[in-house]
Amino acid sequence: RSRGLGDVYKRQMNVLEDNLYTRSWQKLGMTLPRPQAIVVVSAHWFTRGTGVTAMETPPTIHDFGGFPQALYDTHYPAPGSPVLAQHLVELLAPVPVTLDKEAWGFDHGSWGVLIKMYPDADIPMVQLSIDSSKPAAWHFEMGRKLAALRDEGIMLVASGNVVHNLRTVKWHGDSSPYPWAMSFNEYVKANLTWQGAVEQHPLVNYLDHEGGALSNPTPEHYLPLLYVLGAWDGQEPITIPVDGIEMGSLSMLSVQIG
């Protein structure tokens, strides 16, 4: 059965760096069973409705500004899979899923991690968008539907950050984590294996935590985690390949199921 990886994306410069986090992603790529294909849920494709990339050769999207030229010169030419995209349309029904053949591609939430895990870019991939109009529990249920892919050897990668507050980022000097960021990061880890009604899940109700709103002033970087937790069968081990908080308020926590 294929693995699920949650909240593995962090910040753009990791693409060019060799550090604790990038080495952990490289290790995952070398040690996990090689998937037949990969479905990525990225914080950077936050849409009204649900879409899936359905082109043969998705472009590499550089959806950021103000970084070194080397980052813009980096491309990740992994093949797309229109067949897998259509499979997702059928699997997620009755949720309507739009086949995107030109508007998007692989944004840095997906290729920024996968270029470290699978640098040869030779595994077929599709990217699934996050519907901005739906509540947290809905995204968890989407993960439950995606769980079937894992039995087909398809890896689910959810890319985001459980703490992502750019307004409080420490760009210079002291980069120690804020107490509220550490508290929320620990809260997430403590509740990864919680089982019960989805509507009562502490990580679905993350805004109930005193640091939830400050850690996630907008939801798009948090929600990918719920897709992976939804795909968990309740019995597999859940492990943390790497953890940490950078620049005060960017969580580097990665979660692996299976």
Segments the model singles out, each with a brief description of its role:
Residues R1-L5, Y9:
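Single conserved hydrophobic/aromatic residue that forms the stacking wall/gate
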Residues Y9, V41, L88, L128, ...:
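A residue-level signal for conserved active-site and pocket-lining positions in enzyme catalytic cores
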Residues R11, H44-F46, V162-V163:
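Catalytic metal-binding/acid-base residues of hydrolase active sites
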Residues N19-P33:
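Short catalytic helix/loop segments, enriched in acidic residues and glycine
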Residues P33-G49:
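N-terminal low-complexity or amphipathic/hydrophobic leaders
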Residues T53-P77:
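A charged helix-plus-loop insertion that forms the helical arch/lid used to bind
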Residues A85-F140, K145:
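Internal, conserved structured core segments that host functional sites
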Residues E90, P94, I123-P124, S132-K134, ...:
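Surface-exposed, charge/polar-rich loops and edge strands
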